[in-house]
């Protein structure tokens, strides 16, 4: 393959899966050098579809952060995490950046392989999640209170502080933690939905509550509002999923019971419009949990 023109070689290599491309490094030095070129890496990874990281709720102990293609002379962050017996948690992702917890908070760029450590000592909320010595998250189900927003090449981390019907917001813009002057009060008490990450849409983070209402907060303007629920009361067996419909650029709320699955779209007047309702598949009573229900939603709608 050494005799092939570079543009033809690129077209061949661009068609390879990451695993096959990594194996090409051992073929000869010329191809290894070509694959390791930053320009080739940038073009290759820009052609890849989005991938999913399979992290268990208790954190992944064996997560490798070493890239597939580039040579890495120093020990990667993932290898350090394994040797330190740290667990890896993905707290959020936005615009190609990842918010990771590996014995501490990191904002990482998987393409450039750069990361930034964030000192959590000034935060009121982050230390409440951690176990001894920051090795693991003691309350990962509450880690969904952490929002991650990236806009105009800047990132902000927003932690929502829940106190009965009152909500405060803690912000980190990369330099320090501070408490926003903005607070919001709800008419009734309803806990934030556990294990449900906030949805980032049009510059605003949205946290779902168990009654179907939503706490919305804009990290730039620091304005907050309560989006009312489309339901009159909480149904015991009802499961809720908040998402963003990229096609119409609106929030979508999916509710599921043992009988039906309903899809609602947030309209301009802050009211929910029923977009679709279908009969639910048969599930055993002990199988109707959040994980099973989310998998069912994925198979039905996506």
Curated annotation (Swiss-Prot):
All copies of domain F-box, residue ranges: 1-48
Superkingdom of the source species: Eukaryota
Record-linked PANTHER family: BNACNNG10540D PROTEIN, F-BOX PROTEIN CPR30-LIKE
Protein name from the UniProt record: F-box protein At1g20360
